[in-house]
Amino acid sequence: MTASSSASTCARPLAAPMPRLNFQAVAPELYKAQAGINALLHESSLGIQLLELVFLRVSQINGCAFCVDMHTRELLSRGEDLQRINSIVTWPEVDFYDGRERAALNWAERCTRLSQAHPEQQDFEALRPHFSEREMVELTYAIGSINVWNRLCAGFAAPVARKPIKL
């Protein structure tokens, strides 16, 4: 490739990426079952706002562009503060999150980064003041569920369309 052909290639707009595979179409029964878990979680007492914060943080950790975009948009549509959304990547360093959110985000990180270290007893104990046993199970299912979605969307290259967010 010559310098001039390289420059012209870089100047062209890139085509929208295509998914490697449409997992929803290939295995609709599995997709439906996974979506059913999310529907149940949205009916839980955890609250959609907390779920979406957890979904966003786990998606950031896993590097799933599709899911980060989707959960950012969902939080904005539900009135979440932009500063809290932008700061979730550094949640331990800021005081924008209450004790319940901090415990959930910590648990989400520990349960997502299992290859680094498993959740410790102190991480579990930090949940107790904020969550019932049922809610702890629901939270852990939510973390597992978003990890599945991240692997599906990142693994099969779910495309992210450029859609500016209007604030």
Language-model features, listed with the residues they occupy:
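Hydrophobic alpha-helical segments
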Residues: 1-167
